């Protein structure tokens, strides 16, 4: 079992994760151990796979990945075992595989190789991507990075000024965690949750509500016009998976993770500008976000239109 193999391969990780239950530690199981144990793992997954909401063990469609299991990554943490495939076997999705026409659309795709690696397109297909000749369908964004311009500015000073502006305009603050949300909204009265997000967005489109805080909402919300005249991105969008966190722990400058994080930042920046006649001020904050965009040259992964707006600002 994995329980027997891990302490032999990496006793320090075993101690940190299993014995000490350190939630900050994670380890990637070596591929030779994973391949040796994958059949045994599959039997366990098959045994405990169910749809019971209160007692769910497997959180993905097992038949979709069963053939790929020996080739997956396996990351072990104190709270979970995460199995990550290299990609989805789209041949098993019959409606997709047999479709006579497939249309792929993206507003912020900085790496089109994903069409080949994840969706199975032929390389020659991406040589004829349809793109607009100009960026005149994109609204106006003034992109500000206050601490990059003046190192003496503190988060508290920036917050005070933005809070003042929220008396005149609707201001949206997107933060990566509930803990950071407390910096902007200690009482929680202005923090939008999944329970009230629909009403909150609807109200912002109708009238002035001031400042609202959204936690980890970098896509899926549209705030055109006066619904959002100032958008604050405070902090770096969190990584999705334990595998991504593991990669970051051993290679903080990974170009793959950097590209994905910058794409999420750009998605967040687009929440307040929804048409070519729209306008919004975007404020970027946070030391980690600054490191990604400036020290690690993450700005180079912006789309061309956003890169131009960033440069002009």
What do the predicted segments below correspond to?
Residues 90, 96-100, 138, 165-170, ...:
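Short, well-ordered loop/turn elements at secondary-structure boundaries
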Residues 148-149, 203-292:
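Conserved RecA-like P-loop NTPase helicase motor core
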Residues 175-195:
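Conserved helicase motor "Helicase C" RecA-like lobe of SF1/SF2 P-loop NTPases
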């Amino acid at each position: 079992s994995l329980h027997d193999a891990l302490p032999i391969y990496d006793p320090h990780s075993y101690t940190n994760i299993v014995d000490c239950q350190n939630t900050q530690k994670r380890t990637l199981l070596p591929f030779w151990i994973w391949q040796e144990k994958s059949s045994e793992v599959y039997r366990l997954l098959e045994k405990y796979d169910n749809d019971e909401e209160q007692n769910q063990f497997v959180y993905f469609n097992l038949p979709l990945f069963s053939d790929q299991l020996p080739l997956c990554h396996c990351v072990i943490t104190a709270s979970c075992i995460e199995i990550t495939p290299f990609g989805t076997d789209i041949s098993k999705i019959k409606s997709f595989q047999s479709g006579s026409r497939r249309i792929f659309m993206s507003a912020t795709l900085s790496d089109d190789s994903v069409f080949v690696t994840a969706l199975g397109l032929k390389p020659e297909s991406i040589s004829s991507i349809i793109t607009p000749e100009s960026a005149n369908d994109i609204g106006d964004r003034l992109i500000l990075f206050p601490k990059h311009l003046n190192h003496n500015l503190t988060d508290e000073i920036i917050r005070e000024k933005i809070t003042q502006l929220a008396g005149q305009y609707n201001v949206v603050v997107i933060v990566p965690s509930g803990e950071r949300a407390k910096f902007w909204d200690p009482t929680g009265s202005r923090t939008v949750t999944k329970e009230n997000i629909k009403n909150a967005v609807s109200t912002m489109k109708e009238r002035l509500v001031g400042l609202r805080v959204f936690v980890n909402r970098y896509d899926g919300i549209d705030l055109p016009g006066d619904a959002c005249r100032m958008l604050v991105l405070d902090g770096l969008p969190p990584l999705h998976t334990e595998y991504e966190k593991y990669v970051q722990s051993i290679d903080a400058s990974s170009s793959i993770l950097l590209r994905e994080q910058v794409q999420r930042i750009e998605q967040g920046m687009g929440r307040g500008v929804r048409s070519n006649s729209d306008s919004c001020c975007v404020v970027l904050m946070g030391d980690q976000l600054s490191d990604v965009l400036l020290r690690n040259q993450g700005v180079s992964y912006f789309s061309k239109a956003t890169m131009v707006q960033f440069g002009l600002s």
